[in-house]
């Protein structure tokens, strides 16, 4: 998909397959180098601790994601909201990746008044695993953002 990926500043030292994730190809080393964020220092500061941000073609930001495993859903939503409030309106997905059993908590928190404008999507661990296995088994190419959307549930409740 040719995404460049920001990994939270505090997570870049995590080792995967005997290599720090911050050393993999396609990892953004400094948010200040991303064209979209160059003029928005406050947004850059707000994004430093966000778990994952995808960038594409220097002009797009397909997703801002928080992986909730040990921290609460609210903290991830707060980080994304803080970022959104410091960046001009821009089309992107705000995604919470969390265990399947946390779905109700994600829905409940994402629908609180302070988070509603994120229009959060929920990406359960089981869907991440299913997508990963499918990509590995079939060696999928040409995956689109719309295809990924099939694995992410919109959680904003209308009314």
Q: What are the residue ranges of the model-derived segments?
A:
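Solvent-exposed, non-transmembrane amphipathic alpha-helical segments
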Residues: 18, 25, 32, 84-85, ...
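Conserved beta-strand termini and adjacent loop/short-helix elements that scaffold enzyme active sites
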Residues: 8-10, 15, 97, 123-128
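Domain-level recognition of nuclease-like catalytic cores that cleave nucleotide substrates
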Residues: 100-159
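Catalytic cores of nucleic-acid endonucleases
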Residues: 35-50, 60-124
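Amphipathic alpha-helical segments
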Residues: 1-2
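Active-site metal-binding core of divalent-cation-utilizing nuclease and nuclease-like domains
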Residues: 5-59
């Amino acid at each position: 998909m040719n995404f460049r990926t920001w990994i939270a500043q505090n997570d870049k030292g995590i080792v995967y397959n005997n290599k720090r994730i911050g050393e993999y190809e396609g990892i953004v080393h400094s948010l200040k180098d991303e064209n979209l964020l160059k003029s928005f220092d406050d947004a850059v500061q707000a994004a430093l601790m966000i778990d994952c941000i995808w960038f594409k073609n220097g002009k797009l930001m397909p997703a801002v994601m928080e992986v909730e495993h040990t921290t609460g859903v609210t903290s991830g939503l707060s980080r994304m909201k803080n970022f959104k409030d410091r960046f001009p309106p821009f089309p992107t997905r705000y995604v919470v990746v969390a265990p399947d059993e946390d779905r109700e908590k994600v829905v409940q928190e994402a629908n609180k008044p302070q988070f509603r404008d994120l229009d959060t999507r929920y990406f359960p661990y089981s869907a991440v695993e299913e997508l990963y296995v499918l990509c590995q088994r079939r060696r999928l190419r040409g995956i689109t953002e719309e295809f990924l959307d099939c694995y992410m549930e919109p959680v904003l409740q209308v009314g």
